[in-house]
């Protein structure tokens, strides 16, 4: 019995990063900047990739049962603005359509950053994406190290991490 309880505890701790964080409008609403993005399919988040998102604004609606996110992508170097509306499902993940079906949630938050995990499902399969956004236009070494650890937890190789700050010239 003790072995079973220890196993259950170990599994609970190892899967803790998959829990959805509850957020309030005061934590979410406002201007954000994309800092880092990574995916298990790097093509999707590389320069010109369909999931390389430059977040600009997040709005919490109905006590965060809905998130409205305004962001840019680049097609052949040209910025294109998009707005998606994600509705929270029973499992706590937000669901929306953009370049396929997306299931996302906030996995980490602090006063000045939020980290999203997204599963994108399209004709080519399933892609795990993580994205960290900040209130400021730059990040610290500690934020990058924390993001690298989160990427590792989602089995995304460190070499798949993209620094978005140098290429974010949309909405300026």
Curated annotation (Swiss-Prot):
Disulfide bonds join 60-64, 79-170. Residues 1-16 form the signal peptide. SUPFAM superfamilies: Lipocalins. PROSITE patterns: LIPOCALIN. Gene3D superfamilies: 2.40.128.20. One of its GO terms (cellular component) is extracellular space. CDD domains: lipocalin_OBP-like (cd19427). InterPro entries: Calycin, Lipocalin, Lipocalin_CS, Lipocln_cytosolic_FA-bd_dom, OBP-like. Keywords: Disulfide bond, Secreted, Signal. It is found in: Secreted. Induction: Repressed by estrogens, androgens and thyroxine in adults (at protein level). Repression by estrogens and androgens does not occur in immature 20-day old animals. Induced by prolonged light deprivation and starvation (at protein level). Transmembrane segments: none annotated. GO terms for molecular function: odorant binding; small molecule binding. Expressed in the lacrimal gland from where it is secreted into tears (at protein level). Belongs to the calycin superfamily. Lipocalin family. PANTHER family: LIPOCALIN, ODORANT-BINDING PROTEIN 1A-RELATED. This is Female-specific lacrimal gland protein. The gene is FLP.
């Amino acid at each position: 019995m003790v072995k079973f309880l220890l196993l259950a505890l170990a599994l609970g701790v190892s899967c803790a990063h998959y829990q959805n964080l509850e957020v309030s409008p005061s934590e979410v609403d406002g201007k954000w900047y994309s800092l880092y993005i990574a995916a298990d399919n790097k093509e999707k988040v590389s320069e010109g990739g369909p999931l390389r998102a430059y977040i600009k604004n997040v709005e919490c609606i109905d006590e965060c049962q809905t998130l409205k996110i305004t962001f840019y992508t680049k097609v052949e170097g040209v910025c294109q603005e998009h707005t998606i509306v994600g509705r929270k499902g029973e499992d706590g993940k937000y669901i929306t359509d953009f370049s396929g079906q997306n299931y996302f949630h906030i996995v980490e938050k602090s006063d000045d950053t939020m980290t999203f995990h997204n599963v994108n499902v399209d004709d080519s399969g399933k892609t795990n994406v993580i994205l960290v956004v900040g209130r400021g236009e730059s990040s610290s070494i500690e934020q990058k190290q924390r993001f690298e650890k989160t990427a590792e937890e989602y089995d995304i190789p460190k070499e798949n991490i993209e620094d978005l700050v140098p290429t974010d010239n949309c909405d300026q």
